[in-house]
Amino acid sequence: MRVDVGGGVRLFVDVDGAGWIPEGQSMRQRPTLLMLHGGPAMDSSLFRGSGLDELTDVAQVVVYDHRGAGRSDWRSPQEWTLDTWADDVVRLCDVLGIVKPIVLGSSFGGMVAQRYLARHPGHPDRVVLAGTSARLDLDLVAACFAARGGDRAGAVAQQYLAGDQSLAADYDELCLPLYAIEPVEAERFARVIANPDLDAHFTKEWNAMDLRSGLAQVTCPVLVIGGELDPICPLEAVRDVANALPPGLVRIIELQGASHLEAAADDIAPFVRDFILESSQSQS
């Protein structure tokens, strides 16, 4: 379904699992897990079949496509900013009546979640930041691509991520396969409704952003997950995120032998499930 979040902007939303379940003579409300997809030019179909689908046994799962992506309204590039996407989380929750969501931000979605935490620190119950970074360290990322895919992959990554769109095809050929340990079935990406203009537009903000200062004011528990072999969000960058968060609220999990897709979605469901079950909402 498409939901109007204000200003005539419609976001595509999909809901799995019951929000209320019978418990004796009454009904108990379950936590809501709101999942923010990566890309940014991808869509929420990337979560399907990742294992995160199975979390409906502990929460109502809500996925949506960001403004500018997938089945949501694409709108004007002037609206494709982290501030807008972060505020869309709150707008969507207001419309759907979601209070104190558990927010999972994957890859680019984790950048949105970090900005959301900075702008709306009291809004979530808890947050998962999976396979994401607070800033783009081009030299580090290029070195990681080179280590896994050779010097050419490293050079292409450095130039493409800096904004050279003429290397998009080379990046897709040499670098994207390194996002996973095992080959990814072609159908997974074929299902995505891609907006390549969104990637090109966000590259400017990505190269300039540094989200670390906004994480200092976080007031809820945060689970940070990274992959040992992730070239686009290396473990050093994941640790950078964790170190920017208040020590008493952050927990970090480093997945050995995992690349980006594994750390951002495919292998994280057991850790997310435990994190949900720790929520006061699950215990009420």
Regions inferred by a protein language model and the residue ranges of each:
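Conserved acidic catalytic loop of the alpha/beta-hydrolase fold
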Residues: D83-P101
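Flexible "cap/lid" loop of the alpha/beta hydrolase fold
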Residues: V127-Q159
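Short glycine-enriched nucleophile-adjacent loop
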Residues: G110-P121, V127
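Catalytic active-site module of serine/aspartate enzymes centered on a nucleophile-bearing elbow/loop
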Residues: G248-S284
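Conserved HGGG/HGGXW glycine-rich cap/lid loop of the alpha/beta-hydrolase fold
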Residues: G6-W74, Q78, L92
